[in-house]
Design a protein with these regions (language model features):
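Mobile cap/lid helix-loop segments that gate and shape the active-site cleft of serine hydrolases
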Residues: 33, 183-213, 219
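N-terminal cap/lid segment of alpha/beta-hydrolase-fold proteins
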Residues: 26-65
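Short beta-strand element of the alpha/beta-hydrolase
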Residues: 67-78
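Alpha/beta-hydrolase active-site loop
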Residues: 113-134
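Short beta-strand/loop motif that positions the catalytic acidic residue
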Residues: 223-225, 229
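Short amphipathic alpha-helix adjacent to the substrate-entry channel of hydrolases
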Residues: 86-104
Length: 289
């Protein structure tokens, strides 16, 4: 009972502090997330650009172990035009608590880059992790690509269209698996003028759709979808999964009946986790590959 009271008091104090200083909702959420379960290696450069930095969340060792840890690279969403790695501390905390190393990078977005240019930085991150993660006791053969929304599009595109990873002398099956949360994979025709600028002419837009590159040779794929998502329609995940299955590829679908678009990432946060069904689906997938 005392623990519950202490946690409640901490949440109330954090909310009041953020409200009185005009914090963003994401900062409020992150202020409620525990920080004592991991070590943070911040602002590691993987390139020369100001946005080519990544954070590494390492599980705190409870006992000496030489076993290498599985690694998750998490690409955040933001409509391909925004996002900050520090905002996703809550997601890292959820995953690092299960013993995984979590890498969250920034990457260049619109208007600095357009499609397919915005794929370059995520590929560079994947290469950096494969090359360097053993220094942090990470398993280079146990690296998972993951993302939410636009970040899921990027992660899944790397898994399905091998031309992107080939630029870094990598192949999709160099990765243990891929996790897409509420991702857009089959979203033509484009209606937004901004997206038409990002993804180019009508004749070229087909190249931006992961579903168009399915050949069944992808690494194991988990597509998690909120069935109340009104931002990225659930059909994106359902259609992609069907095509992968039709090509004898490896794919699992986790449907969440009452989740909307934002729920598909914020439900990882400890204060909003509820029964933890989203986190359970992710950890079950990772632990089985």
């Amino acid at each position: 009972m005392q623990l519950i009271k202490n946690n409640f008091s901490r949440y109330v104090i954090a909310i009041i502090a953020c409200l009185t200083s005009a914090c963003s909702p994401i900062k409020v959420l992150n202020s409620l997330v525990p920080e004592n379960g991991y070590e943070l290696v911040s602002a590691v450069e993987y390139g020369a650009n100001a946005r080519q930095k990544l954070d590494i969340y390492l599980p705190k060792a409870t006992e000496k172990s030489t076993a290498l840890k599985k690694v998750i690279i998490f690409y955040y969403g933001g409509n391909w035009d925004s996002g900050e790695r520090a905002d996703y501390k809550f997601a890292a905390e959820a995953l690092v608590g299960h013993g995984y190393i979590v890498v969250i990078p920034d990457y260049r977005v619109y208007p600095e880059v357009l499609f397919p240019g915005f794929m370059a930085d995520p590929v560079s991150v994947a290469k950096w992790v494969k090359t360097n993660i053993k220094k942090y006791n990470g398993d280079a053969n146990g690296v998972f690509l993951a993302g939410h929304s636009a970040g899921a599009h990027i992660a899944v595109m790397m898994a399905i269209n091998p031309e992107y990873l080939a630029e870094a002398s990598l192949k999709p099956n160099d990765f243990a698996g891929v996790i897409g949360l509420a991702g857009p994979y089959d979203f033509l025709p484009l209606k937004s003028d901004r997206l038409k600028v990002i993804f180019g002419s009508d004749a070229e837009q087909w190249k931006s759709q992961p579903i168009n590159f399915v050949d069944g040779k992808n690494p194991p794929l988990l597509l998690a979808v909120g069935m109340k998502d009104g931002t990225v329609w659930p059909r994106n995940s359902i259609n992609l999964a069907k095509k992968i299955k039709d090509n004898n590829g490896l794919v699992e679908v986790a449907e969440f009946a009452n989740y909307g678009h934002i729920d598909m990432v914020t439900k990882l946060a400890k204060p909003l986790r509820g029964d933890g069904e989203l986190l359970k689906a992710i950890t079950l997938f990772i632990n089985s590959h």
